[in-house]
């Protein structure tokens, strides 16, 4: 019987596959194409993530133009770099707008402070302004009883009546968010914005009614954020016609009735963008515009505002720094009293 010889146990050996790294220069044509496609794909993904990080407001604020030449585009980038340098400018909200209007009332006397307890939007501002001016008219002729006079919570009826009687310039601020398409949605969006503490897509614009000059002036630091200048003019012309009937021109007995009831003049105060992209300075620009208007109702905005973004920013920063301390006296939000 022959001995049985068992074969030696076989062992499994695992060999790690060798990976050869080649430079782009030494790679094959197919490898080069693959690497280029992957690189382009990663670039597109990165750009998409950057755009997602931007808020919708930032995208609206950005200026894009295919008509600018290379040199002009370089200048724009240099100016943008200058704008972004330095500390951010403070955000002026409704409380700041009220305080500044009180400061202007103290200086010019003919200005009615802004009532921030009644939020105005593009859906209700026409009716509200008409009602406010009709209230002034009835107060002037003593047709409104003190108990019937609506006044802001931080102002007494007696003081509000006196302010109405002595005022001829009525500034109104309008709040807007493009995502709201009804008055109810706009007010809900306003509450959400205030609760979050973030500006988001919200924006302030200014409407000035001047009885002495028979003029309605509209200002938007983005000039077309709510609507185009022509669309705003069409809306304001209806308001101007109503105001012309409320405050007819002075004339003799033989004066033409149609001429006496002629509409107020409508003026679009902003035909260019004065607010820089990435800055939330619409409230401060509204106050600056009001200050210029009270100095000279016929002023030209383009003559006041530099075309250079860094100079515009410096101008507004100087305006803010010189007025914030004086405004602080109205931080309690109490209306100024008439002497």
Swiss-Prot record:
The chain crosses the membrane at residues 36-56. The keyword Glycoprotein does not apply. It is found in: Secreted; Host cell; Membrane. Pfam families: Peptidase_C48. It comes from the Bacteria. Its EC number is 3.4.22.-. One of its GO terms (molecular function) is deNEDDylase activity. It is a single-pass membrane protein. The active site is at residues 203, 220, 282. One of its GO terms (biological process) is proteolysis. GO terms for cellular component: extracellular region; host cell; membrane. It is an enzyme of class 3 (hydrolase). Keywords: Hydrolase, Membrane, Protease, Secreted, Thiol protease, Transmembrane, Transmembrane helix, Ubl conjugation pathway, Virulence. The keyword Hydrolase applies. InterPro entries: Papain-like_cys_pep_sf, Peptidase_C48_C. Belongs to the peptidase C48 family. Effector proteins function to alter host cell physiology and promote bacterial survival in host tissues. This protease possesses deubiquitinating and deneddylating activities. This is Deubiquitinase and deneddylase Dub2. It comes from Chlamydia trachomatis serovar B (strain TZ1A828/OT).
